[in-house]
From Swiss-Prot:
This is GMP synthase [glutamine-hydrolyzing] subunit B. Its EC number is 6.3.5.2. Residues 1-185 form the GMPS ATP-PPase domain. GO terms for cellular component: cytosol. It catalyses: XMP + L-glutamine + ATP + H2O = GMP + L-glutamate + AMP + diphosphate + 2 H(+). It is an enzyme of class 6 (ligase). Pathway: Purine metabolism; GMP biosynthesis; GMP from XMP (L-Gln route): step 1/1. It comes from Pyrococcus horikoshii (strain ATCC 700860 / DSM 12428 / JCM 9974 / NBRC 100139 / OT-3). The gene is guaAB. Keywords: ATP-binding, GMP biosynthesis, Ligase, Nucleotide-binding, Purine biosynthesis. It comes from the Archaea. Heterodimer composed of a glutamine amidotransferase subunit (A) and a GMP-binding subunit (B). Catalyzes the synthesis of GMP from XMP. Transmembrane segments: none annotated.
Length: 308
């Protein structure tokens, strides 16, 4: 791929499409939205408004990381929106995975439209990539930036990366000068930790899975492993364990670590036993609500990478 030519073409397309108007971008800090943001910033400069929505479903330290990186280091117009209560309220009592994704997508776009009106933006730029719309089209699962979009969107949509796969986006991000901490980040689902909690999403469940997820990422990095994704899932199943001399019913965490090139297929990683033991020990020691840790050895297919 000639990335120089690709960037020239996309910058020209965005500039011609947006004209003298303003645009907002769904910025999450992941490689997809970050790369789309840099492309758009090259095209329209200060008329790009990066909107970061704290859904309450983000990784540990994510809000601080995004603000520091894009406001302080890249000098972008960054609008921080704390919408945690709104998302938790919308998901109250919801257990169906597909419904969860669609609700998150709907609320996400509602928040954007509100910010866009204040800014006077007419365009919404998203970091949608090929696997997102392929899986949505094939009815495998809805992606919040595809299937969750309302039919009557009040913003005109621009998706400059929609024909690229994840490995290509990483190459493009590197070409654009994004730091390694961005272009080598593991993929993170648009709905965030909400799809790593099986069943109803609550602040308490998110707190547990967020801590477990951080431990998995830390131990994988410490071991020098380079998986496609490594994360924790709260299964919503309590099992019996022993605490001192008494029986205790505690939560169960599943650990998922996979290798892949583009996310369309994936293999469970053959992780050294001592790494898995360390992960299990830390999760059960540092998160008192968890009493059992499982390792998922299923490939994609038949399973998807995420549990929901």
């Amino acid at each position: 791929m000639d990335w120089g030519r690709f960037v020239e073409e996309k910058v020209r397309e965005i500039r011609e499409t947006v004209g003298d108007s303003k645009a907002i971008i769904a910025l999450s800090g992941g490689v997809d939205s970050s790369t789309a943001a840099v492309l758009a910033h090259k095209a329209i400069g200060d008329r790009l408004h990066a909107v970061f929505v704290n859904t309450g479903f983000l990784r540990k330290g994510e809000p601080e990381f995004v603000v520091k990186t894009f406001r302080d280091e890249f000098g972008m117009n960054l609008h921080y929106v704390d919408a945690q209560d709104r998302f938790f309220s919308a998901l109250k009592g919801v257990t169906d995975p597909e419904e969860k994704r669609k609700i998150i997508g709907r609320v996400f776009i509602e928040v954007f439209e509100e910010v866009a009106k204040k800014i006077g933006a007419e365009y919404l730029i998203q970091g949608t990539i090929a696997p997102d719309w392929i899986e949505s089209q094939g009815k495998i699962k809805s992606h919040h930036n595809v299937g969750g979009l309302p039919e009557k969107l009040n913003l005109k949509l621009i998706e400059p990366l929609r024909d690229l796969y994840k490995d290509e986006v990483r190459e493009l991000a590197k070409f654009l000068g994004l730091p390694e901490k961005i272009y080598n980040r593991m993929p993170f689902p648009g709905p965030g930790l909400a799809v790593r909690v099986i069943g109803e999403v609550t602040p308490e469940k998110i707190r547990i899975v967020r801590e477990a997820n951080a431990i998995v990422e830390e131990e994988v990095e410490r071991a020098g492993l380079r998986p496609w994704q490594a994360f924790a899932v709260l299964l919503g199943v309590k099992t019996v364990g022993v605490q001192g001399d008494i029986r205790a019913y505690k939560e169960t965490i599943a650990v998922r670590i996979v290798e892949s090139i583009d996310g369309m297929t994936a293999n469970a990683m053959n992780v050294p036993w001592e790494v898995l033991q360390r992960i299990a020990f830390r999760i059960t020691s540092e998160i008192p609500e968890v009493g059992r840790v499982l390792y998922d050895i299923t490939n994609k297919p038949p399973a998807t990478i995420e549990f929901e």
